């Protein structure tokens, strides 16, 4: 499994999680620490300007330990309703295209899969990532306009 953190300019971090690993608060906090280092290296000045992170209510995301770590980082948590893939940019923008790209391919080992995922993400222009974030703004506005009622494509 891969956890991908990205913004309108591109990928910040891809954290590949070994098969069979349970993602609990400890594991997720380690990933967030990696993300913070990635932001320091890839987006100079972003940490001082402020970071917002979009989270659903999965247990590792809302665990006391995770919330405390994000507060220590000074990051703003943006939540979205549970079971709302229409409001999760990775679910409606990134993963469908990645799945399409990988469809029908055969890989001899996990490293080959990881390499191909990294290659796919690296080959996307900043404008592609920006489009995913812009779609979020449009989808959120639709949700607001409908007083929170379900929005289909």
Identify the role of each PLM range.
Residues 1-153:
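Surface/interface recognition patches
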């Amino acid at each position: 499994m891969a956890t991908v953190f990205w913004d309108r300019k591109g990928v910040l971090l891809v954290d590949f999680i070994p098969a069979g690993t349970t993602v609990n608060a400890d594991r997720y906090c380690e990933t967030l620490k990696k993300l913070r280092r990635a932001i320091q290296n890839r987006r100079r000045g972003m940490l001082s300007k402020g970071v917002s992170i979009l989270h659903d209510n999965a247990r590792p995301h809302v665990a006391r330990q995770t919330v405390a770590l994000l507060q220590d980082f000074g990051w703003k948590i943006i939540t979205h309703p549970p079971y709302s893939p229409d409001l999760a940019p990775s679910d409606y923008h990134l993963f469908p295209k990645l799945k399409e790209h990988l469809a029908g391919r055969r890989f001899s080992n996990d490293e080959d899969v990881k390499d191909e995922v990294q290659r796919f993400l690296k080959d996307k222009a900043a404008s592609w990532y920006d489009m995913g974030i812009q779609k979020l703004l449009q989808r959120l506005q639709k949700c607001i306009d409908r007083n929170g009622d379900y929005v289909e494509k």
